[in-house]
């Protein structure tokens, strides 16, 4: 600790310096009021704690000095010291912000506990600051998270013979005291009818967390809304257009930021699913009758994430959604779930996703989606997923 002391007893000053110096504390003891005030008001301001007598030269003057010191060192705890007969002065100092006080017994036994007392005050102040910062962090994260979640659709529509459900879930971190904080993130999904026959399904994921990721995904959401009226029936052209526009947005690509996107169009008459991936996971199909489950492509079928380079070309992939089957599109937070202490021993992964879907084969899609998130969370052994997760699950009836 860096300790500044204003003391009025030279003999005690030497002993205090000896006791506090045992733990290699950086201690400056001032034997005169003038020296103490010079150090406190004009000298170095980076003290961990200040200890001062509240009796000298007299209690009123000491209080005035204390107020000056408090004004100069708002973040530094000040501890007072007084003899037993002077304790009735303590209340005034405590009311004005003094953190604690020490009774100076005539035998000097107080010096044996001096370091412990000062250290406990410093630790208490640091803990309070950490709690304050943690609470401010929670408030800021919550406000950004609510802003981000405001663009998530709540009422989804599906064409005849289809059902659709979706879910977004933020990642979590733990801050002071182990309390979980739900992070503001950059995940996003949308489901809407392009026309009477074509249903759009998309999931997006902006890199990072916090305000930048949130604003990146809101920028993409705005662009999607602006150009969806063009009614692109070519998913690759749509994704390329979004990419070119995002590359013009500094909020997205500053500091290497980017967005992954899976954009698909389902034709409800032909049951054809046309999709384009910009760095997003490959869609999964689960045929309920046979329990066959598979990805619709490989990692090579995904293009470059959005916002990295303009003029990029993207590929169109076309698949038929079989009767009595389910189609899953998702962001990588679902698969990249792992226990914090077992990062190198695997993740929930595509295998975990497929096993969860198969286990929910006979359940309604809402239950299957709930089970998917539950199983992914369970894999983390309580630590929570470290990335946001967006999932859209589509069910085709016979």
Located regions from the model:
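Two-component/phosphorelay signaling modules centered on CheY-like receiver
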Residues: 7-34
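Conserved acidic residues
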Residues: 48-49, 99, 325, 332
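… and, occasionally, acidic/histidine-rich disordered N-termini of signaling adaptors
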Residues: 132-326, 382-398
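CheY-like receiver
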Residues: 60-129
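Active-site-proximal, acidic helix/loop segment immediately C-terminal to a metal-coordinating Asp/Glu
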Residues: 211-231, 321-384
